[in-house]
Every structure is written in structure tokens, then in C-alpha cells.
């Protein structure tokens, strides 16, 4: 057999273009401060599991009930992922096959709703997600969505409005959870409202799952009928999703909805990486990590407010804060770009009752999980906040074209900080 290098040639030789792009991305992650709240940095072990030979294996079905042969070892992997997820969140049932956060939510809708049914979800402008009923998303196109939001005076969830809307519209399902809400969710009150109108309570805890696992946010599982979460973000695993419940009937419906309802063969290499991340989150030091994430987010929010940047709801109880830039007279879009040039990565984000268009916005969303994984503590996050204020003030004074000197100065200081907290040595 002629040796074509198929089993031996490394990526740098076989595809230098892709190898080069990956190396550049590694350099970006090493040299920039990552503040996107939905991003994190996985362990070397998670990377290794996701890049394993499990990518070769098709495994339609569930452990012990596959439609393909040769699944005895991937069954071990998936069973470990399931058992670790159940232990981590104290639940009876876990489906670890959803490929993404959108698909995990779609699976619940497929299991519990019919097209045209009514459900309630947090409005995108108040910190919800596209899959919580946005009109441009499948969830908003296939179902009758009644959105709820926050109060204008304090940007906190308006539980009176939520109860009133639930009694008025009688939804079949109420969805709690969001992507840009920085305060503690009252799961018990949501369940009370759901029970009053005979609705399912679904919680999407994608953003705060790591904080729940680490004991820094109340778990929704004692109250929710079904819980979804991504496995990355604050949970620090690979990109993917899962569905949790304590109800055997719902678990059966969810399993059927994920496969064969929504997906075919699961991504076994990703499920292996999920299992590794769950194992890491079960270690005692993960509780320390979760506590540090919250402490860092609070320090950053506090320092931003000292610098004259408004923080939605006046602070944070979790891993993120939402900065309202209107007092500074700059937009989220311009600020995201300016901070990017200074090697601070974040995302533009709408604020409650935002007058700007979705691709412009009046705010930026800032998260602590990735920086905390890197080793940053409160002092580093306060310094990061001061750099953000410096860039924003420069942007307000000099405009987008005249802020290069400020951005270059901050960039040099950012790179010096990053050099003290290296990523993936030897990779």
C-alpha cells in the first residue's frame, strides 16, 4: 500500500492554510482579554477528548439501544457523561446529545408543545435569547409567543407583569432564563405562576450553569419541570447542549424529541469532551472558580460605574454585567470595535428599552468566565474595567478615527497582562 500520509501527516503539512488560521486564533486567545460572557477557555483534557478518534463513530440511538454496531466503547463515554451530569446538578435524568443550545431548546418545544401553542419567554431586548420566542427564530415562527420583560425604572424582572400575562394568555409553557440578565432568578416564584395557569416551567440556564454547579446561583431543578443548558459558557466545557429533568415522563419525551425527532447520530467526540468537563466541575476547586467568577464580575461592574459607565440594574449577581453607554455618548458597535483594537474582546448588546438598532446598540455585554479561567482575580478585573473606561472616554472625545493613540496604549498594557497569564503552554 502506498503511503499517502493519510494516517501520519500532521495538519501543518497537510493543510497549512487551516493550520495557519488555527495558530492565529491561538495567538489571538493568548494575547487578548476575552470578555464575551458566553465564551470560556476549556482545559487541555477537554481539547484532547474533542479531537479524539471518537469523531469517526456513528452512534444513532442511546447507550444499549443503538442502530449501529461497534458502540460498546462510545456507550461507556455517553453513560459517563449522563451520570456525571446527573451528579453535578442533582437530577434524575439527563440527555447529553443536543449539539447546541438552540437544538436543546428546540427539543423541549418538540417534546412538550404543538405548533401554534402559546409559550412565554424573556424578550430579547430585556436579556432573552433568540430561541425564547424571537420573531426571526423558529421559536417565534412556530408558536404563539407572549414576551415578558424588565421594569424600566430598575431593569429587574417584573414578576407582577409576568403573573398578569400568564393569567391572561394561559401559556402551555413558561420559559425562564436569559443571556444578558445579571440578577438572581426566582425559580420558585416562576413555578408558582406556572402552576397557577397549568403551564410547564422550562428553565434555560445556559449562561449560569457553571454558577449553579459551583453553588453560586440557586438551582432551578427543584422547581422546573425541565432544564436546558449549554455545556460551554460558565460550565467550561465544549460547545454543545443538554436537557435535565426529574420527571420520567418528560425524560422519555425529551429522548424521543432529540432522537429521532431532531437529530441523527450524536457527536460522540463532543460528548466525551462534555463528560471530561463535567468531571472537572465535580472537583472541589470548581466551587472556588465559580465564586471567583462572581467576585470578578462584581469588581468589574463596580469599577466601570466609578468610571461613569452605567450598569444595567445597578450591578450583577452572576458572571456578567451589561454596560449602558448612553451617558458616554457612544454606541455598542463603535465601542466593541474600539476595544477590539485594544485587544479587549466583548460584544455589542442591546440594553432594556434600547433606542438603537440591534446591530448598533447602546450597550456592551461583559463577562468574567474566560478571564477567571485564565487566573485573573478582582485586581485584574478592576484594571480591565479602567482600560475599558479609558478607551470609551477616548472614543467619546476623539471619535472612531482619532482614538488610535489611546487604543494602542491600552493594547500594549493588555498584552503585558496576558503575558503574565499564559494559555496552553506547549501547544
Curated annotation (Swiss-Prot):
Compartments where located: Cytoplasm
Organism of this sequence: Paracoccus denitrificans (strain Pd 1222)
Catalytic activity: (6R)-5,10-methylene-5,6,7,8-tetrahydrofolate + glycine + H2O = (6S)-5,6,7,8-tetrahydrofolate + L-serine
Plays an important role in substrate specificity (site feature) positions: 232
Keyword Cell division carried by entry: no
The protein's annotated pathway: One-carbon metabolism; tetrahydrofolate interconversion; Amino-acid biosynthesis; glycine biosynthesis; glycine from L-serine: step 1/1
Pfam families the UniProt entry points to: SHMT (PF00464)
Enzyme class name: transferase
Gene responsible for this protein: glyA
Primary location group: cytoplasm
Keyword Transferase (UniProt): yes
GO CC terms, sorted: cytosol
Protein name as annotated: Serine hydroxymethyltransferase
Record note on quaternary structure: Homodimer.
Amino acid at each position: 500500500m502506498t503511503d499517502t500520509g493519510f494516517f501520519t501527516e500532521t495538519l501543518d503539512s497537510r493543510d497549512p492554510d487551516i493550520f495557519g488560521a488555527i495558530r492565529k486564533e491561538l495567538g489571538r486567545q493568548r494575547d487578548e482579554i476575552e470578555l464575551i460572557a458566553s465564551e470560556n477557555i476549556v482545559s487541555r483534557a477537554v481539547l484532547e477528548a474533542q479531537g479524539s478518534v471518537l469523531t469517526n463513530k456513528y452512534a444513532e440511538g442511546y447507550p444499549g439501544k443503538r442502530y449501529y454496531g461497534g458502540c460498546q466503547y462510545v456507550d461507556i463515554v455517553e453513560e459517563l457523561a449522563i451520570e456525571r451530569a446527573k451528579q453535578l446538578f442533582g437530577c434524575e435524568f439527563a440527555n447529553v446529545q443536543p449539539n447546541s443550545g438552540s437544538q436543546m431548546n428546540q427539543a423541549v418545544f418538540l417534546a412538550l408543545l404543538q405548533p401554534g401553542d402559546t409559550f412565554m419567554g424573556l424578550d430579547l431586548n430585556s436579556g432573552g435569547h433568540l430561541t425564547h420566542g424571537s420573531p426571526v427564530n423558529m421559536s417565534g415562527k412556530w408558536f404563539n409567543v407572549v414576551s415578558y420583560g424588565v421594569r424600566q425604572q430598575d431593569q429587574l424582572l417584573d414578576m407582577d407583569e409576568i403573573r398578569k400575562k400568564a393569567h391572561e394568555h394561559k401559556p402551555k409553557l413558561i420559559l425562564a432564563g436569559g443571556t444578558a440578565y445579571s440578577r438572581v432568578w426566582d425559580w420558585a416564584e416562576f413555578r408558582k405562576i406556572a402552576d397557577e395557569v397549568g403551564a410547564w416551567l422550562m428553565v434555560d440556564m445556559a449562561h449560569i450553569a457553571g454558577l449553579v454547579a459551583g453553588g453560586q446561583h440557586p438551582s432551578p431543578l427543584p422547581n422546573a419541570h425541565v432544564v436546558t443548558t449549554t455545556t460551554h459558557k460558565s460550565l467550561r466545557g465544549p460547545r454543545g447542549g443538554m436537557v435535565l429533568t426529574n420527571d420520567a415522563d418528560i425524560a422519555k419525551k425529551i429522548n424521543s424529541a432529540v432522537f429521532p425527532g431532531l437529530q441523527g447520530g450524536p457527536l460522540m467526540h463532543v460528548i466525551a469532551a462534555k463528560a471530561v468537563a463535567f468531571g472537572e466541575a465535580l472537583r472541589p476547586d470548581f466551587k472556588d472558580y465559580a465564586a471567583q467568577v462572581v467576585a470578578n464580575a462584581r469588581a468589574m461592574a463596580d469599577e466601570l460605574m466609578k468610571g461613569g459607565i452605567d450598569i444595567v440594574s445597578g450591578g450583577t449577581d452572576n458572571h456578567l454585567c451589561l454596560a449602558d453607554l448612553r451617558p458616554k455618548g457612544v454606541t455598542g458597535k463603535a465601542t466593541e470595535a474600539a476595544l477590539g483594537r485594544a485587544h479587549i474582546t466583548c460584544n455589542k448588546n442591546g440594553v432594556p428599552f434600547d433606542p438603537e438598532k440591534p446591530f448598533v446598540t447602546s450597550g456592551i455585554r461583559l463577562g468574567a468566565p474566560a478571564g477567571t479561567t485564565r487566573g485573573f482575580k478582582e485586581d485584574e478585573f478592576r484594571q480591565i474595567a479602567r482600560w475599558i473606561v479609558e478607551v470609551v472616554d477616548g472614543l467619546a472625545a476623539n471619535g472612531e478615527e482619532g482614538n488610535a493613540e489611546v487604543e494602542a496604549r491600552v493594547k500594549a498594557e493588555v498584552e503585558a497582562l496576558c503575558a503574565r497569564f499564559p494559555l496552553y503552554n506547549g501547544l
